[in-house]
Amino acid sequence: ITLFLNCGMRLSELVGINISDINFKERKIKLLGKGNKERMIYLNDACIQSLQDYIESRENSILEPDALFLSKKGRRISRRRVEQIVEETLQATGLSGKGISVHKLRHTAATLMYQYGNVDTLTLKEILGHKSIATTEIYTHLSNDILKNAADSSPLANIKNKKK
């Protein structure tokens, strides 16, 4: 969940990560995105710590030694299992049934970067691995709608100035 929310990666990108794709020294990770397109994303402290903690605690696999995330059987974790883990985490935190999905975590990451990280749409396009800026702009329009709705929902929104 830390990687989804901090990096905005796709589910397929997460399950495809190999240990050899992570460069802790340069704080970056190589992802294989849509259309087998490679991209590098940089990791913040939360991601570095989560990855280091996970690697230290995970069992090594003879079957797939380079796969980062493993199933209990020592194989690369499946997309479905990641979805189940996310759902289990949501249930444990009381957030289950609220329409949150793995893909919504990606949307949330993009929205947070755009709103609070001073990340422009071109940079966000590269981080998310979008082919077209139009796809990225969906996230920014969503953010602007949220901001407009927030302004409109103010209890002071309907107070009018009295003319003197």
Q: Language-model segments: which ranges?
A:
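Short pre-functional
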Residues: 1-12, 28-29, 111-112, 155
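Catalytic-site neighborhood detector that most strongly recognizes the C-terminal catalytic loop/helix
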Residues: 35, 128, 132-153
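Active-site/catalytic core of tyrosine-dependent DNA strand-transfer enzymes
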Residues: 45-96
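Catalytic tyrosine of NAD(P)H-dependent dehydrogenase/reductases that use a Tyr as the general acid/base
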Residues: 99-103, 139
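Short coil/turn motifs that cap or connect alpha-helices
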Residues: 10, 18-20, 96, 131-134
